[in-house]
Swiss-Prot record:
Catalytic activity: 5-methyltetrahydropteroyltri-L-glutamate + L-homocysteine = tetrahydropteroyltri-L-glutamate + L-methionine
Keyword entries, A-Z: Amino-acid biosynthesis, Metal-binding, Methionine biosynthesis, Methyltransferase, Repeat, Transferase, Zinc
Broadest EC class assigned to this enzyme: transferase
Gene, per the UniProt record: metE
Binding-site list for 5-methyltetrahydropteroyltri-L-glutamate: 24-27, 120, 576, 620
EC number: 2.1.1.14
Protein name (Swiss-Prot/TrEMBL): 5-methyltetrahydropteroyltriglutamate--homocysteine methyltransferase
Length: 772
């Protein structure tokens, strides 16, 4: 096919779409099901209606081929686990008794059975449930979900492409099952897994699928020759199947690297590549391997992870270059649109001009359709859209929101000494222990306490004008009193105020910092039914006034025990926001760090002796390619130290991280120079404690002993077992006792029981230590 004919054949498609519905209907229905207020048939009916509405919306917008199977009640990787029959032994009875309840038990756990581990989906803010595989794992195909959802789309008269997690990525995302040898590699199960995928592909072909998309994003990370060989073998074998659909292998989030020539030569019919941000180098790499002669290329030129409008002219230029490299070039987003909110049209509080800088899922869909039209019919067919794109981009570049001279001057004046504590840790820790007087194995929580219905109602009442600010603050003070009282009665050593005034750990600060924008309906899925509204970091950042001081000092007035000041760190403020793309991330991080530094200093001046600066996103924002790590970690750790280095030696700086693998950033954790770090560890059985010990981490640490992502209450015996494991890696004088993460999403009953068990565990082990 010539470049001209390839252009004429251009189609518009997407890899996936937000699942929740315009008003988060799916979240509400699932939580209603868990509480017994919604029946299983009602939940399934609502889910089918949401899928149909999404498909119709995409088709009406001009999408030629809609995705099927991207919908999920909880997580698409968990759906894949069900599809291949890799149900953990402890969950098989529940799944056999009731497939839906068993599915949710794998995701959330029960009082009797622990859930699957949860971790970040590559470097995004989405979480997946980690498959557990062992030498004895037997795979069996169950394509019910995939075939059913394809049939629903076909019944609407649509061209649909089923979307699956690819077999090699699935195995690379997995971990050894409990009881498996520690050195077991799930990838060794590829020969068992491929026949199951072959059966699913056959089922989908029989159900009418012309194309099936197999996602292999694991190969945008550095991979070994053995892993690349597994990729080659997988698609050589799947490609050799006779009765199968056409195969479109998709990658996203970064450049494909050494996997690109493997897939370019594979006996598949199509390849989907990301051409945004760091992945823009895929264009030159594709040319270097000779392109994709005789194959379909789906070009991800619209950024599926950020919310800024597309530079249509630049994207058309990229598409024009790609025309000579494949038999057919289609247009898409860089990844699933799962990672962005649904529609800017729902926003009423953002200035109309600024709103024109933004593109959520519906607007990105329109951009994709526009680009496909421009590619197929020429730029004359989209002159109006191109003119609007140029005007909106110029408006953003010239806005005073994006450039504040005072902020820029302060950031440029930062010196190395500004990001360095006045004394080394060995000297600081003695001053802190003398000042705080804490027992061995001190107990604390990570920050937030349950956000009850009463708290949410108070926030809604204030927003809707049913109460004034004085009435709202009275309710917040009452909640803080209750939280402090509970912690004192329970016997916790370092307290928190519970954060009842905070809607979200990033949004709360973003709403008080100049340069951020807030949305009303910009919800994106974090995990399961947990949705967040990432703020939009649109311009230069400054702090007009203190943000947390009065609530922290109020809480401290209620107790003699230390109350932690609680802040969200600069890297997490970026990672959990939609961040401006018109300057380097390190420059933006420095601006945020300086604003937070002022808050840290104000907290100390108000008498706060323990200040926690959370950086749960430090690891998840790590670039996917090792070649990019050093530059990222340099600015990320500097931003943290810039935030925290203005305090006295006897002020104890804490930080917190969660949701991630920490082994490859232990040096960076050390470079933060925090006095105490708390980490998620309960589901991974204290693995992080051993990683810290192997590195020789010299400071205090609190690997979590209570998994807060499950409603299950861990017994004191379970917590004690985890703590004893932690003590094998971290000396008692440097070990803290705490949950994995904040308690915002938990209910009070399990919170009370779990924290009482946590304190009892610490006291038991203190006794054992003193006896020894």
């Amino acid at each position: 096919m010539t470049a001209k004919s390839a252009a004429a054949a251009a189609r518009a498609t997407v890899y996936g779409y937000p699942r929740q519905g315009p008003n988060r209907e799916l979240k509400k229905a699932i939580e209603g099901y868990w509480k017994g207020r919604v029946s299983a048939p009602e939940l399934r009916s609502l889910a089918a209606d949401l899928r149909a509405a999404n498909w119709r919306r995409l088709a009406d917008a001009g999408i030629d081929e809609v995705p099927a199977g991207d919908f999920s009640y909880y997580d698409h990787v968990l759906d894949t686990t069900v599809m291949v029959g890799a149900i953990p032994e402890r969950h098989r009875a529940a799944v056999a008794a009731d497939a839906l309840d068993g599915y949710f038990a794998m995701a959330r756990g029960t009082q009797e059975v622990a859930p699957l581990e949860m971790t970040k989906w590559f470097d995004t803010n989405y979480h997946y449930l980690v498959p557990e595989l062992g030498p004895d794992t037997v795979f069996t195909a169950d394509s019910t979900k995939q075939v059913t959802e394809l049939a629903e789309a076909v019944a609407l008269g649509l061209t649909a492409r089923p979307v699956l997690v690819g077999p090699v990525t699935y195995l690379l995302l997995a971990k050894p099952a409990p009881g498996a040898p520690a050195d077991f590699e799930p990838l060794t199960l590829l020969d068992r897994l491929l026949p199951v995928y072959a059966e699913v592909l056959t089922d989908l072909r029989a159900a009418g699928a012309e194309w099936v998309q197999l996602d292999e994003p694991a190969f945008v990370q550095d991979r070994t020759p053995a892993e690349l060989n597994a990729l080659e073998r997988a698609y050589r074998e799947l490609g050799a199947l006779t009765d199968r659909p056409k195969l479109l292998v998709a990658s996203y989030f970064d450049r494909l690297g050494d996997a690109l020539p493997v897939l370019a030569k594979a006996p598949i019919e199509g390849l989907a590549l990301d051409f945004t941000d760091a992945a823009a180098t895929n264009l030159d790499a594709l040319a270097a391997v000779g392109g994709l002669p005789g194959k379909r290329l789906v070009a991800g030129v619209v950024n599926g992870r950020n919310i800024w409008i597309n530079d249509l002219q630049k994207s058309l230029s990229t598409l024009g270059t790609l025309l000579g490299l494949a038999d057919r070039v289609d247009v898409s987003a860089s990844c699933s649109l799962l990672h962005v909110p649904l529609d800017t049209g729902a926003e009423r509080d953002i200035e109309p001009q600024i709103l024109r800088w933004l593109a959520f899922a519906r607007q990105k869909t329109a951009e994709i359709v526009t680009l496909a039209k421009g590619l197929a019919q020429g730029t004359d067919a989209i002159t109006g859209e191109l003119a609007a794109s140029r005007a909106d981009m110029a408006s953003r570049a010239g806005s005073p929101i994006t450039r504040n001279p005072a902020v820029r001057a302060r950031a440029e004046a930062v010196t190395d000494d500004d990001a360095r504590r006045s004394q080394p840790y060995a000297e600081r820790t003695a001053a802190q222990r003398a000042h705080l007087g804490l027992p061995p194995l001190p107990t604390t929580t990570i920050g937030s306490f349950p956000q009850t219905g009463e708290i949410r109602a108070a926030r809604a009442d204030l927003r809707d004008g049913r109460i004034d600010i004085a009435g709202y603050e009275e309710r917040i003070r009452a909640e803080i009193q209750e939280v402090i009282s509970f912690q004192e009665k329970t016997g916790l050593d370092v307290l928190v105020h519970g954060e009842p005034e905070r809607n979200d750990m990033v949004q709360y600060f973003a709403e008080q910092l100049t340069g951020y924008l807030a949305t009303q309906h910009g919800w994106v899925q974090s995990y399961g039914t947990r949705y967040v509204r990432p703020p939009i970091l649109a311009g230069d950042i400054s702090r007009p006034e203190p943000m947390t001081v009065r609530w922290t000092t109020y809480a401290q007035s209620l107790t003699e025990k230390p109350v932690k000041g609680m802040l969200t760190g600069p890297v997490t403020m970026l990672a959990w926001s939609f961040v401006r793309d018109d300057q380097p991330l390190g420059d933006t991080a420095r601006q945020v760090a300086l604003a937070l530094r002022d808050e840290v200093n104000d907290l100390e001046a108000a008498g706060t002796s323990v200040i926690q600066v959370d950086e749960p996103a430090l690891r998840e924002t790590l670039p996917l390619r090792a070649a990019d790590h050093t530059a990222y970690l340099a600015w990320a750790t500097e931003a943290f130290r810039l935030t925290t280095s203005g305090v006295r030696p006897d002020t104890q700086i804490h930080t917190h991280m969660c949701y991630a693998e920490f082994g490859d950033i232990v040096q960076a954790i050390d470079d933060l120079d925090a006095d105490v770090i708390s980490l998620e560890a309960a589901r991974s059985h204290m693995q992080v404690a051993h990683e810290l010990a192997t590195h020789g981490y010299p400071r205090e640490a609190g690997p979590g002993v209570y998994d807060i992502h499950s409603p299950r209450v861990p017994s004191a015996e379970e917590a004690a077992a985890l703590l004893r494991t932690g003590l094998k890696a971290i000396p008692a004088e440097r070990l803290w006792v705490n949950p994995d993460c904040g308690l915002k999403t938990r209910g009070w009953p399990e919170t009370r029981a779990s924290l009482e068990n946590l304190v009892a565990t610490a006291r038991t082990l203190r006794g054992e230590l003193s006896a020894s």
